[in-house]
UniProtKB/Swiss-Prot annotation:
The keyword DNA-binding applies. Belongs to the alpha/beta-type SASP family. It comes from Priestia megaterium. This is Small, acid-soluble spore protein C. It comes from the Bacteria. One of its GO terms (biological process) is DNA topological change. SASP are bound to spore DNA. They are double-stranded DNA-binding proteins that cause DNA to change to an a-like conformation. They protect the DNA backbone from chemical and enzymatic cleavage and are thus involved in dormant spore's high resistance to UV light. Keywords: DNA-binding, Sporulation. The record marks E31, I32 as: Cleavage. The lineage of its organism: Bacteria, Bacillati, Bacillota, Bacilli, Bacillales. InterPro entries: SASP_alpha/beta-type (IPR001448), SASP_alpha/beta-type_CS (IPR018126), SASP_DNA-binding (IPR050847), SASP_sf_alpha/beta (IPR038300).
């Protein structure tokens, strides 16, 4: 698991806005992968990895909406 995380961090061009958020994002990624029965890594299919990424996005949007709580 750690090797995959390190490789993904090196290849990512996305910059996190909140310091320390990488650990939380990685934890969310592996929890969702576990829920979906996906083994993340270089041998996983793009469809399997994409399903995890899509679910991360969905959950992050839900969290943001809850935090905004009708402020906008």
């Amino acid at each position: 698991m750690a090797n995959y995380q390190n490789a993904s961090n090196r290849n990512s061009s996305n910059k996190l806005v909140a310091p320390g958020a990488q650990a939380a994002i990685d934890q969310m990624k592996f929890e969702i992968a576990s829920e979906f029965g996906v083994n993340l890594g270089p041998d996983a299919t793009a469809r399997a990895n994409g399903s995890v990424g899509g679910e991360i996005t969905k959950r992050l949007v839900q969290l943001a909406e809850q935090n905004l709580g009708g402020k906008y």
